C-alpha cells in the first residue's frame, strides 16, 4: 500500500508540474500576443491621426469619419489595452472596482463607435457612387459633424445599461479584462449585438452590394459593345460638328476599355471583400462566444477560445488604419515625406493643394462616382485638365491606392433618370498620384487635352481675325479691286453688291460673327 501510494503521489506531482509548465507556456504566449497587438494598434492608428492632423488638406468630409475611427482606436490602445496587458501578467484585476467599470464602459463604447463608423463610411461611399450629383448636398460639413455626434451617442446608449442594473460588469479571468457579464442577461447581450454590431454590418452589406452592382453594370456595357463615343470637331467656319459613333467589341479601344473595366470590377470586389471580410474575421468569433455564453452559460466555451476571440476583436483596430490609410499611396507618400524629408515629396506644394480636395483616404470606393468637375466644384477649385486620363466612356484609372474610377452617368440615365438633364456628352474623370508620373504617362501616350483645344481655337481665331482686318483695310483704302479674286468671291454674297446697304450689313454681320466667335465659341471651347 505504501508503494502504491507513493507512486500515486508521484503521478499527481508530475501532472501538476506538467499543468504548471503548460500554463506558464500559454501565459507567455498570451502576454507576447497582447503586447504585439497593443503596439500595432497604437502605432498604426497614431500615424494616420498625425498624418491627417498635420496635412489638413487631406481632412475632407469623408476623411473626417476615418479620422474619428482611427482616433477612437488609438484611445483604445492607450486607455484599455495596457490594463489588459497588466492583467495577463498578474492574472487578476488590481486597479479597483471604479476603474473596472470605467474600462468596461470604454471598451464597449469605443468598439461600438468603431463598428458604427464603418457603417457610416459605407453610406458615404454609397451616396458618392450612386448619386454623385446629389452627394455635395447630402454630405455637408454640418451633417458630418452631426453624424459623428450621433455615432457616439448611439454607442453610449448601448453601453450604459450594465452600469444601471441591466446586466453587470465583472472581471473575466479568461478575457483578462473587465467586460459586461454576457451570461447573466441574455436580453442585454442580444440588444447590444443588434444595436451596435448587426445594424452597421447589414448597412455595409447593402451599400457595398449596390456599389459592386454598379461596377458589374458598367463592365457589362463595355463587354457588350454598348460604348458610345462623342467626338467634337471644329470646322473651318468656327462651328462645331458633333458625330456619334458606337465602338465595336472587336476594336482595340473597346478591347482595352473592356480590360480596364474588368480590372476595375475585380479591384472593387477585392476592396469590398477586404472591408467586409476584416469585419467578419475580427468580430465574428467574439460575437459567437458571447452568444454562446448568453444561451448556454459561462463554461460552454473553452478558455483558450474565449481568450483568443476577445483578443482577435482587438485586431480590428489594426485593420482599420491599414485599409483606410496605409493602403493608399498618397497617404504612404505623405507619411514617408514626414519621416524621411523631401526625398519622398515629389509633388510641389501648390500642386498638392490643387489636388487635395479631390482625394479621399477611402477613395478606392468613393472615386467610383465623382466626376472631376463635380469634385472640383465641391472643393471650390478649378478642375484639373492636365492630370486626367480618360476613355470614351468617361472612365479613367486612378493611381491612388490602385483605385479605378468609374463615372455613373450611364447608370443614372438607365435606372434613375434625372429630369431636365442635358444630352450626354463626353465626360472626363480626374485622377492623380503625382504630377511627375502623370507627365511621363502623357509623354508616352499623347492625349488631346482641353488646353490643346483652346490654344488651337485661339490660333485659328487669331488667323481669321487678322485676315478679315487686312481685307477690310484694303477695301477702305484701295477699294474692292485690291482684294484677290478668291477672297472677293468668298466675301460676295450671291445677288448682293459691296456698294449696297445689304453689302454693308454683310460686313457688319461678319464683324458680329467675329465678335460671336470671340465671346461665345472660345468660351464654349474653354468650358468643354
Curated annotation (Swiss-Prot):
<keyword id="KW-1015">Disulfide bond</keyword>
<keyword id="KW-1133">Transmembrane helix</keyword>
<feature type="disulfide bond">
    <location>
        <begin position="100"/>
        <end position="178"/>
    </location>
</feature>
<keyword id="KW-0297">G-protein coupled receptor</keyword>
<keyword id="KW-0472">Membrane</keyword>
<dbReference type="GO" id="GO:0007189">
    <property type="term" value="P:adenylate cyclase-activating G protein-coupled receptor signaling pathway"/>
</dbReference>
<comment type="function">
    <text>Key negative regulator of Shh signaling, which promotes the processing of GLI3 into GLI3R during neural tube development. Recruited by TULP3 and the IFT-A complex to primary cilia and acts as a regulator of the PKA-dependent basal repression machinery in Shh signaling by increasing cAMP levels, leading to promote the PKA-dependent processing of GLI3 into GLI3R and repress the Shh signaling. In presence of SHH, it is removed from primary cilia and is internalized into recycling endosomes, preventing its activity and allowing activation of the Shh signaling. Its ligand is unknown.</text>
</comment>
<dbReference type="GO" id="GO:0005929">
    <property type="term" value="C:cilium"/>
</dbReference>
<keyword id="KW-0969">Cilium</keyword>
<keyword id="KW-0807">Transducer</keyword>
<feature type="topological domain" description="Cytoplasmic">
    <location>
        <begin position="328"/>
        <end position="528"/>
    </location>
</feature>
<dbReference type="GO" id="GO:0055037">
    <property type="term" value="C:recycling endosome"/>
</dbReference>
<feature type="topological domain" description="Extracellular">
    <location>
        <begin position="165"/>
        <end position="190"/>
    </location>
</feature>
<keyword id="KW-0812">Transmembrane</keyword>
<dbReference type="InterPro" id="IPR000276">
    <property type="entry name" value="GPCR_Rhodpsn"/>
</dbReference>
<feature type="glycosylation site" description="N-linked (GlcNAc...) asparagine">
    <location>
        <position position="15"/>
    </location>
</feature>
<keyword id="KW-0675">Receptor</keyword>
<feature type="transmembrane region" description="Helical; Name=4">
    <location>
        <begin position="144"/>
        <end position="164"/>
    </location>
</feature>
<dbReference type="GO" id="GO:0004930">
    <property type="term" value="F:G protein-coupled receptor activity"/>
</dbReference>
<dbReference type="GO" id="GO:0007186">
    <property type="term" value="P:G protein-coupled receptor signaling pathway"/>
</dbReference>
<keyword id="KW-0966">Cell projection</keyword>
<comment type="similarity">
    <text>Belongs to the G-protein coupled receptor 1 family.</text>
</comment>
<feature type="glycosylation site" description="N-linked (GlcNAc...) asparagine">
    <location>
        <position position="101"/>
    </location>
</feature>
<feature type="transmembrane region" description="Helical; Name=1">
    <location>
        <begin position="31"/>
        <end position="51"/>
    </location>
</feature>
<feature type="transmembrane region" description="Helical; Name=6">
    <location>
        <begin position="270"/>
        <end position="290"/>
    </location>
</feature>
<feature type="transmembrane region" description="Helical; Name=5">
    <location>
        <begin position="191"/>
        <end position="211"/>
    </location>
</feature>
<feature type="topological domain" description="Extracellular">
    <location>
        <begin position="1"/>
        <end position="30"/>
    </location>
</feature>
<dbReference type="GO" id="GO:1901621">
    <property type="term" value="P:negative regulation of smoothened signaling pathway involved in dorsal/ventral neural tube patterning"/>
</dbReference>
<feature type="topological domain" description="Cytoplasmic">
    <location>
        <begin position="52"/>
        <end position="64"/>
    </location>
</feature>
<feature type="topological domain" description="Cytoplasmic">
    <location>
        <begin position="123"/>
        <end position="143"/>
    </location>
</feature>
<feature type="glycosylation site" description="N-linked (GlcNAc...) asparagine">
    <location>
        <position position="4"/>
    </location>
</feature>
<feature type="topological domain" description="Extracellular">
    <location>
        <begin position="86"/>
        <end position="101"/>
    </location>
</feature>
<dbReference type="InterPro" id="IPR017452">
    <property type="entry name" value="GPCR_Rhodpsn_7TM"/>
</dbReference>
<keyword id="KW-0217">Developmental protein</keyword>
<keyword id="KW-1003">Cell membrane</keyword>
<feature type="transmembrane region" description="Helical; Name=2">
    <location>
        <begin position="65"/>
        <end position="85"/>
    </location>
</feature>
<keyword id="KW-0325">Glycoprotein</keyword>
<protein>
    <recommendedName>
        <fullName>G protein-coupled receptor 161</fullName>
    </recommendedName>
</protein>
<feature type="transmembrane region" description="Helical; Name=7">
    <location>
        <begin position="307"/>
        <end position="327"/>
    </location>
</feature>
<feature type="topological domain" description="Cytoplasmic">
    <location>
        <begin position="212"/>
        <end position="269"/>
    </location>
</feature>
<dbReference type="GO" id="GO:0060170">
    <property type="term" value="C:ciliary membrane"/>
</dbReference>
<dbReference type="Pfam" id="PF00001">
    <property type="entry name" value="7tm_1"/>
</dbReference>
Amino acid at each position: 500500500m505504501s508503494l502504491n501510494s507513493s507512486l500515486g503521489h508521484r503521478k499527481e506531482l508530475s501532472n501538476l508540474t506538467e499543468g504548471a509548465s503548460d500554463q506558464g507556456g500559454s501565459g507567455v504566449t498570451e502576454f507576447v500576443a497582447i503586447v504585439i497587438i497593443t503596439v500595432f494598434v497604437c502605432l498604426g492608428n497614431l500615424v494616420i491621426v498625425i498624418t491627417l492632423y498635420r496635412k489638413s488638406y487631406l481632412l475632407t468630409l469623408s476623411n473626417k469619419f476615418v479620422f474619428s475611427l482611427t482616433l477612437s482606436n488609438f484611445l483604445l490602445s492607450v486607455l484599455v489595452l495596457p490594463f489588459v496587458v497588466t492583467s495577463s501578467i498578474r492574472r487578476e484585476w488590481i486597479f479597483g472596482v471604479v476603474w473596472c467599470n470605467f474600462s468596461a464602459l470604454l471598451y464597449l463604447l469605443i468598439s461600438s463607435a468603431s463598428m458604427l463608423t464603418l457603417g457610416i463610411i459605407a453610406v458615404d461611399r454609397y451616396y458618392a457612387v450612386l448619386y454623385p450629383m446629389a452627394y455635395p448636398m447630402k454630405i455637408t460639413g454640418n451633417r458630418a459633424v452631426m453624424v459623428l455626434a450621433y455615432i457616439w451617442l448611439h454607442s453610449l446608449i448601448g453601453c450604459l445599461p450594465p452600469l444601471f442594473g441591466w446586466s453587470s460588469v465583472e472581471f473575466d479571468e479568461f478575457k483578462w479584462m473587465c467586460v459586461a457579464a454576457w451570461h447573466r442577461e441574455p436580453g442585454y447581450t442580444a440588444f447590444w449585438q443588434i444595436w451596435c454590431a448587426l445594424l452597421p454590418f447589414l448597412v455595409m452589406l447593402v451599400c457595398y452590394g449596390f456599389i459592386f452592382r454598379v461596377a458589374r453594370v458598367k463592365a457589362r456595357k463595355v463587354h457588350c459593345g454598348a460604348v458610345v463615343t462623342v467626338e467634337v470637331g471644329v470646322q473651318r467656319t468656327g462651328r462645331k460638328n458633333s458625330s456619334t459613333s458606337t465602338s465595336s467589341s472587336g476594336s482595340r479601344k473597346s478591347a482595352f476599355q473592356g480590360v480596364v473595366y474588368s480590372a476595375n470590377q475585380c479591384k472593387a470586389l477585392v476592396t469590398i471583400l477586404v472591408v467586409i471580410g476584416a469585419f467578419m474575421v475580427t468580430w465574428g468569433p467574439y460575437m459567437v462566444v458571447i452568444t454562446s455564453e448568453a444561451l448556454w452559460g459561462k463554461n460552454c466555451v473553452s478558455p483558450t477560445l474565449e481568450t483568443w476571440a476577445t483578443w482577435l476583436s482587438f485586431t480590428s483596430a489594426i485593420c482599420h488604419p491599414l485599409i483606410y490609410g496605409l493602403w493608399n499611396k498618397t497617404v504612404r507618400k505623405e507619411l514617408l515625406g514626414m519621416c524621411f524629408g523631401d526625398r519622398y515629396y515629389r509633388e510641389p506644394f501648390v500642386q498638392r493643394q490643387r489636388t487635395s480636395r479631390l482625394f479621399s483616404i477611402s477613395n478606392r470606393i468613393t472615386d467610383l462616382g465623382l466626376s472631376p468637375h463635380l469634385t472640383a466644384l465641391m472643393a471650390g477649385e478649378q478642375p484639373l485638365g492636365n492630370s486626367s486620363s480618360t476613355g470614351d466612356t468617361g472612365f479613367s484609372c486612378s493611381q491612388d491606392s490602385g483605385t479605378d474610377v468609374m463615372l455613373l452617368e450611364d447608370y443614372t440615365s438607365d435606372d434613375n433618370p434625372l429630369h431636365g438633364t442635358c444630352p450626354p456628352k463626353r465626360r472626363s474623370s480626374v485622377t492623380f498620384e503625382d504630377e511627375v508620373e502623370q507627365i511621363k504617362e502623357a509623354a508616352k501616350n499623347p492625349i488631346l487635352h482641353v488646353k490643346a483645344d483652346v490654344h488651337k481655337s485661339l490660333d485659328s481665331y487669331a488667323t481669321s481675325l487678322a485676315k478679315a482686318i487686312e481685307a477690310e483695310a484694303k477695301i477702305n483704302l484701295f477699294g474692292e479691286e485690291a482684294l484677290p479674286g478668291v477672297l472677293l468671291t468668298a466675301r460676295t454674297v450671291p445677288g448682293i453688291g459691296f456698294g449696297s446697304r445689304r453689302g454693308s450689313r454683310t460686313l457688319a454681320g461678319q464683324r458680329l460673327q467675329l465678335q460671336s466667335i470671340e465671346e461665345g465659341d472660345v468660351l464654349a471651347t474653354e468650358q468643354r
